[in-house]
Regions:
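Formylglycine-dependent sulfatase
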Residues: 1-384, 389-419, 424-433
């Protein structure tokens, strides 16, 4: 399972990107199926990642916002004592939640994560306590690509231990190295490899100019020299995606070399819509928004012999489906004592069934959105309206006044969902307020 960070819907050649170079992701699309209508549960990092590992809405699993120090984003430097008790150091995914690798262990899967964890930094929240056997990466929301620091705080970990042994190595190269090692060492047994790259997320650096230092210089030179700051941001963004693409290609090649491609599911998607430097066209909005540009993301799935090659799936699917789908592929059933919000989407990907996903809901603080069929209602600080996604994917034409009965229906479904989340036990944001 490969996850990019803040990559836009149009930031792959196979999704229509004309200038970005992603030959290996395009190859993955040719050898597998491209999903055109795939959404995540939250328009930013942490809750989205929590959902894909639990199969549950953020409002059900309790991770419904970021574990983050907002003051750092305004240039405030915390000393080590203040940082130690800050939100991003003490928050984490509720330990009562059952994560995907914990269930896969029942079938003796070897589980490794190399990259961005983002679900808590205390020992009880870290990957080794949540079902993973190996972890090399960082546990907070973002770091500098070379120093591996978050606002001057060392953040890279090997296992539970903070380390500076690889300082100076570009993050994507580091995560590729560890993922390759993991595959080679575990090729003879069942494995779950999770590679959540931090590319192309902005760097978390106190120097605002270095926030846009996303890619090695040699990768940037593959694109025309930028003539403006805005264009420079775009080139850095594209170059970081291209480097990530090559790392993905190395993993795909290795699966081929080891004779494992036929028996390995490969899933790629972005954790949310693209932010600065991204191309979300033709969608409205971006990272942080509940419009499609914040929640609809590129997704590719390959399983030779099971999932059609070169196909496009237009069925509505979400990241909530990943947990039950991978368990099903491993011959496992979800724990009976937890409520899942997703379903096994393998029959849909195989072309044998229609999606049972008929509705989807989002809430990010005061922003709300609901989708029932192709009807999408948005009520946010960045805009409101009722949209028919079947003919208005860009959410430009508000039909609230023309379709009051539809608006009432969709808002009613959102109210019912919110009531269900409020009653979710033992977690959920509405229990905390």
């Amino acid at each position: 399972m490969i996850v990019s960070d803040d990559q836009g819907y149009n930031d792959l050649g196979c999704y229509g990107g004309t200038e970005i170079k992603t030959p290996n992701l395009d190859r993955l699309a040719e050898e597998g199926t491209r999903l055109s209508d795939f959404s995540v549960t939250w328009p930013a990092c942490t809750p989205s990642r929590g959902s894909l590992l639990t199969g549950r809405y953020p409002q059900r699993n309790g991770t419904y916002d970021m574990f983050r120090n907002d003051v750092c984003d305004f240039g405030v430097v915390l000393d080590k004592h203040r940082y130690a008790v800050s939100p991003e150091m003490i928050g984490g995914m509720d330990t009562r939640e059952v994560l995907l690798p914990q269930v896969l262990k029942q079938a003796d899967y070897r589980c490794g994560i190399f990259g961005k964890w983002d679900l808590g930094q205390l020992k009880r929240f870290l990957p080794l306590a949540r079902g993973f056997d190996e972890f090399h990466g960082f546990a907070n929301t973002g770091i500098d690509y070379w120093t591996h620091e978050r606002y001057a705080v060392p953040s890279m970990r090997r296992g539970n231990r903070l380390t500076t042994e690889d300082k100076g190595i570009y993050c994507t190269y580091l995560f590729e190295r560890e993922a390759v090692r993991f595959l080679k060492e575990n090729k003879g047994e069942p494995f779950f490899l999770y590679v959540p790259f931090n590319a192309p997320h902005k760097a978390s650096n106190l120097d605002r100019e270095k926030k846009w230092h996303l890619a090695p210089e040699e990768a940037c030179r593959e694109y025309p020299r930028p003539k403006s700051k805005t264009r420079m941001h775009r080139v850095q963004f594209m170059a970081s995606v291209t480097v990530m693409d090559r790392a993905i290609g190395r993993l795909l090649d290795l699966l081929d070399e080891m004779g494992l491609a036929e028996n390995t599911i490969v899933i790629f998607f972005s954790d949310n819509g693209g932010g600065g430097g991204a191309d979300n066209g033709p969608l409205r909005g971006r990272k942080g928004h509940v419009f499609e540009g914040g929640v609809r993301v590129p997704c590719l799935v390959r399983w030779p012999g099971r999932i059609p090659a070169g196909a496009v799936c237009h069925e509505q699917l979400t990241s909530l489906e990943i947990f039950p789908t991978l368990l099903g592929a491993a011959g496992l059933k979800p724990p009976e004592n937890i409520v899942l919000d997703g379903f096994d989407m393998m029959p849909v990907l195989e072309g044998k069934a229609k999606s049972s996903r008929k509705e989807m809901f989002w809430q990010r603080r005061g922003d709300r959105a609901a989708r029932v069929g192709n009807w999408k209602w948005v009520d946010s600080a960045r805009g409101k309206g009722l949209f028919d996604l079947a003919v208005d994917l860009g959410e430009r034409h508000d039909l609230s006044e023309e379709k009051p009965e539809v608006l009432k229906m969709v808002k009613g479904r959102f109210a019912a969902w919110k009531k269900q989340m409020a009653e979710a036990e033992p977690r959920g944001p509405f229990r905390d307020y």
